Amino acid sequence: MRIFALVLATLAALCSVASAAEHAATKQVVFVCEHGNVKSLMAASYFNQLAAQRGLPFHAVSRGSAPDSTTVPKPIVAGLHADGVDVSDFHPSKVAAADVVDAARVVTIGTELPANAAAEETHVERWDDVPPASTSYDAARSSLKAHVAELLDRLTAE
């Protein structure tokens, strides 16, 4: 019985070490749009889906340069839900220096990074060609999914 307990304790310790190493190896990508609750949220959601499907060590977050709401518009919640993503509990937050300082990539979508969130060593790119989701969810979705797939291809090649 004692040996069994020792084996279980050893396995538990190894699993937690592996989990910590796996978490440390995950690279963060930050998507930033003006309000942080539409384009950046869609991009982060599609990015996380595709990274998981490909088994890649990346995780994305959504931030806003000037969030003005605490919720996500219902059409966006519904559209992402149809794509298998639940954002019903998501609350937009403003991008901060802590978000971008260690990010593998920062992607601005139709906005600028606030001065207090700029980081010297951060790889920043702009996606200014994404159509408004309020005009056409499908067009925004297609544009973002294409950008996300291309970004993941580039990140895995680096």
Q: Where are the regions that the model predicts?
A:
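Bacterial N-terminal signal peptides
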Residues: 5-15
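Conserved active-site segments centered on acidic
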Residues: 21-95
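A structural micro-motif
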Residues: 56-58, 104, 122
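A short, aliphatic-rich alpha-helical micro-motif
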Residues: 100-101
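Phosphate-binding/catalytic loops
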Residues: 111, 115-158
